[in-house]
Amino acid sequence: MELKIDTHSHTYASGHAYSTLIENARSAKENGLAMFCTTDHAESMPGAPHYWFFANQRVLPRFLEGVAILRGVEANILNTEGEIDLPLSVDPNLDWAIASFHEPVFAPSNKEAHTQALLNVIQGGRIDALGHLGNPHFDFDFHAVLHCAKDHNVAIEINNSTLKGHSRVGSVERCYEIARVGKALGVYFTTGSDAHFCQDVGKLDLASELLDSVGIDSHRVITHSPSQFLDFLELRGRGPIDELASLRQ
């Protein structure tokens, strides 16, 4: 499946990534993307940037190296109440918010606790996608969470980095099963490289392979085309981004 948007990438501001936003944009162009989301870790992750880093993203240009930039964050799920580590005042300055579990922030617990946290973060209405759900340390009720995501128009991320099998070991088959459940329920899918170095931005080959293998319809993959992605943002209640209107053509 052709994928024109990468919705998960990091700069050196995350504390354990190694490239600048401009370097990421250059790689995005080289790898054939139309747009990408910059999604550094929110502040609870060790080494992550502070409040003003996210609040000030309005100064970022809408295009770098001819590639559209979406202003975003990878927020941490903090607890079973589904709270995230991002002040509400930041939300108007961002286009895209992922919520993810990370061991340094949310200690792995049990299936029921993880499920409750995911249901609550979806129902909270502040996040657009759930990141790298395949991690076996954070087992959850696939059907309950994906059904909730479908009802609230929250996308399910297919994470290319996870599918390499080097991080979040044990995730690959779980990612395929999550995709199968999501297909049956009719969820929206997004795709992210989870790049921590610029050369990986736009590397979505394994995500594309999974989507094709499971038989996901491209109309349910919001990263298949810029127009689909922008339509999804508006479905989520975000206002139109006038500077990106030309990408709908």
Swiss-Prot record:
Its EC number is 3.1.3.-. Zn(2+) 3 binds at residues 74, 102, 132. The keyword Oxidoreductase does not apply. InterPro entries: Phosphatase_YcdX_put (IPR023710), PHP_dom (IPR004013), PHP_phosphatase (IPR050243), Pol/His_phosphatase_N (IPR003141), Pol/histidinol_Pase-like (IPR016195). It holds the Pfam family PHP. Its cofactor is Zn(2+). Zn(2+) 1 binds at residues 8, 10, 74, 194. GO terms for cellular component: cytosol. The keyword Zinc applies. It is an enzyme of class 3 (hydrolase). Keywords: Hydrolase, Metal-binding, Zinc. Belongs to the PHP family. This is Probable phosphatase VV2_1469. It comes from Vibrio vulnificus (strain CMCP6).
